[in-house]
Amino acid sequence: MAEDNSWKTSNFRQSVVNKINEAIQQTGMTSSKNGIEMENHVFHKARNKDEYLGFVARLILHVREMTAAAQQAQQDGGGNSSQQGGGGGGGGSGMPDPINALQNLASQGTRPQMMGQMGVGPGGPMGGQMGGAGQASNLLHSLRPQMQMGGMGGPMQGNRVGMGPGNQMGGMMGGPNQMQGPGAGMVGGMPGQMGVGMGPGGMSGGKIQMGVGPGGPNQMNPMVMGQIQAQLQNQNAMGGQQMGTVGGTMNAGNQMGQMVGANAGMNPQAMGMASNQVVRQQQLQQQGMGQVQMGLGPGQMGQLSAGVQGGVGHGGPAMQQQQQAGGMGPGAGPNQMNPGVAMGPGGVVGPAGGGGVMGPGPNQMLGAGGAGGPGAGQQGNFVGMGANAMVRKPPEMMPGGNVYPGSGGAVRSVTPNNFLRQSPSPSVPSPVGPGAHGPPSHPGQMIPSPALIPSPNPHMGGVAQRSTIGQSPGGSLNTPGQPGGAVPSPLNPQDEQLYREKYRALTKYIEPLKRMIAKMENDDIDKIAKMKRLLEILSNPSVRIPLETLHKCEAALTSQLGSIRETPTNNPLVEAVSSSLQAATGNHTLQRTFRPCLEALFGPDIKNLPPPAKQSRLALDDTGAAVGTGGGEIPHILQGEIARLDQKFKVSLDQCAISGTRTIKLICWLDDKNLPCVPPVAVTIPEDYPSTAPSCSLIEQEYNATPFLILVQKSLMARICKLPGLFTLSHLLDTWEMSVRQACSPNPTIVAPTGTSVLLGM
């Protein structure tokens, strides 16, 4: 399969930058680097899309963990750390485990069809793994809207939570009956012990079941409490989105009372349903259903407010699913307005297709978003999932999909940006309409109500009022918000107009800033980094920054670049010309561009000029080329002959010649790279040349200097004697060259020249 390079596109990278900036704003962390620099570092470090998304998830986890410790210390007072060891290893402080989260990301990126498998190995703490991997998986899905689960045999599409075609949440791909193995079911069925069993059969095929034994809802052992508390603490730590900590903090001495709210006057009907719910859970476990069931009553489910509530039912006729927008059961208190997020295959929990907590009677049901019999194909509660739907799938996947009991496992479907506020009135819109059928047309339809209304429920007094409804998962809103606060209203029109005018005024600095960065390429690195940061702010209008920051940018740019006037109208032309001149074809481009304009202005070049007078041509090296002896011109015949001479002969006028005569004296040199250098010869051209042959004379002092030159002189004299009566300058110079060649031969005197040999140049 071809490698997916969509993560390298500018639009995809910009969405990642927006999410990083959003996480920084929500946590209130101050960083020396902005989102663009962080994303650029991650982009160059990653080799493929999975690594890229994994690094981004780790980065955002790190940003959120920076403030998680301080917030958790304030909320819990340090009393919850002793309850964190229940998941087979304990999370200590409930902090997310980024290593498991990133391993989970890698497996999710390569096998989206197996994202619903819930194989948790022994020793995996429910709180730490669920919190860290939940955030990371939510981040991954928010970055990958295209992985928003495919079809499930009909209209059940928009809410598939990492499910393969086999409609399983815990097994490999295949039918729902593949959930087999020695660990199936609630092992031992021990009272009060957290069991995570995978049923070998049933129509829901191996979903996680987390049941509480018949010890009573207020007597959960520390293991269960630690795991639930770890979930809640992780939720509290995510950007200040505090939810699910019903009644404030949870202590070992009051483990279940504050969570359920029983110590604060919980209605007896919900309390009575809690124990019945536990019995029902054990029945479901023995049947191998394996659905996600937290051992809490419906009232507790409502108070958990979109925590890890995967309520499912058997789907019998007694399961009267109620299509209520707020999800209130008939016997539940006002604290049950928000339904648990049902995490079934495709959002359909159990064969009945509803997404609530379904007990054996109608009074034990928390309202789900849809009703119908088996195979109804309805959408479950699509609570803020959109592109952020996730299913925890740790890397310790057991063969056959078995989950070891006691290790802890959780399904988490609420992203940090999509926490639901508890609503006191049904008039506040639900995340989805009641009984929504068919896949949602757009994730934007699933934005929960932005109403920030405090709940009148006394049991929710400990829940911090900063839990908010985040932005749409796929949205790239860039409005700055305070950490953990509600989405602020947009700026008033006056401030918006001031911001736009100031930004437009600063755009004139973009080009000078680019040129300055190019000039300072090898200079001060810190200064270049500041300049690049300013350029990023000016070049990215989608990122909103405070108006004070714009004023600071303007002051810095003014100090660096000075006051820049408005761009002149001809500036683009000048820049285009300067860039064209730097190219190799600059002159050609200029001529092709401006010649028609110049011809139109000044007319074409003057044509049909009179032919210039024929000038005398003589290949002479000095200024006396056209100077004839006695003031006359050099004959044209002689000029033509000199012009046609071989390039190895260099001819010039003799400057020492006596003026007043009509004869022409020339000095000739032989310049051949294959012959030795010899002194020049003096040639006298008579007045009636070519009727009279020229004469040649050698400078005796020079040609008598060495035996070689003496041999050249003798050979030349012998050859001249063999020349015919009328010969030309060309004949004379060729004879001179042959004399030099003969002197250079090993046996220069063996062959005497003859008239024929001399004429033939031999």
UniProtKB/Swiss-Prot annotation:
One of its GO terms (biological process) is regulation of DNA-templated transcription. The keyword Methyltransferase does not apply. Its main location: nucleus. Residues 70-102, 311-330, 406-494 are annotated as: Disordered. The keyword Transcription applies. It is found in: Nucleus. Keywords: Activator, Nucleus, Transcription, Transcription regulation. GO terms for cellular component: core mediator complex. Residues 465-481 have a biased composition (Polar residues). One of its GO terms (molecular function) is transcription coregulator activity. This is Mediator of RNA polymerase II transcription subunit 15. It comes from the Eukaryota. Component of the Mediator complex. Residues 76-94 have a biased composition (Gly residues). Pfam families: Med15_C, Med15_M, Med15_N. Belongs to the Mediator complex subunit 15 family. Transmembrane segments: none annotated. Component of the Mediator complex, a coactivator involved in the regulated transcription of nearly all RNA polymerase II-dependent genes. Mediator functions as a bridge to convey information from gene-specific regulatory proteins to the basal RNA polymerase II transcription machinery. Mediator is recruited to promoters by direct interactions with regulatory proteins and serves as a scaffold for the assembly of a functional preinitiation complex with RNA polymerase II and the general transcription factors.
